[in-house]
Amino acid sequence: MRLIQPYDLPLEQLQQYLPPLNRPDDFTEFWQQSRTAMAAEPLEASTELVPYPAKGVAVSRVEYRGFQGARIRGWYARPTAGAPHPGLVVYHGYNWNLEGGIHDIVNWALHGYATFGLSVRGQQDSGESVPSPHGHVAGWMTQGILDPAQYYYRGVYLDALRAVDWLARQSEVVTDRIGVVGGSQGGGLSLAVSALAEGVTVAVADYPFLCHFQRAVNLAPAGPYGEINEFLRRNGDPAIESQVFRTLSYFDVMNLAPWIHCPVLVSAGLIDQVTPPSTVFAAYNHIASADKSIRAYRYFGHEPIPRFHGEKLDFLMRHLEP
């Protein structure tokens, strides 16, 4: 049975919802050191052209060295005529299989964008190189969660930054016109990368994940956030709970949002039980960009929103001009 809106806060309250940031004291230093460590690793990229039944588009398999040596893979589709092109990096949802979605990458290329679709480490065919020093529940949300330096999403975020770097190195890409897009986990990554990377021109995030963890864990225990609930059920020590949320605070898109200055478009479904709308608005309302917009859809949950796709295309065209 579908929920009746409002499932979360009413829209009028969501628009004003601005919980305080909970950044650790060394938040800025942590990310400066993390980016420096990533930059010190060689890219070691390779590209292999593969056949694909689409006219006017060339498709390649890409591999590069991610954080701590993980082999990160993805798909690259570019228009075969009219170079140079604006670029897009596409980030996928949690445990989603990009293999079945290559057509989405190709579709962006048919719209005129040189498009790289990243396969997130461990979730598909990209490797995972950071071992967890402790047990974790099924899934990725609690792998290494007791130490920010060992946490799974540290590698994910840094791999995602390197995806922008890889795309900017392609000769057919206009380096000052690169956008990032994605839904759910991919939406969270789009916002995180916009905060942490240099050279992102525009970002679009569909119902972003990884936002306002403290509230998300309370409101969405059945989705991926539920992995954190399950970990805390099995580890009842209050000191462990405190450390879990301290680790998550380094990766909370809400805490990264004040570093976002590029144009941003965000969507939220008001009956979304996976990425509750208040968690999305918490991050959005902290974004520093003067050019930002959010679309709230009253009758949609955690699902593709057809009307937003047109909004997304228009927003990207205005800022990237393919």
Across the structure, where does each feature detected by a protein language model lie?
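Cap/lid segment of the alpha/beta-hydrolase catalytic domain
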Residues: 99, 105-158
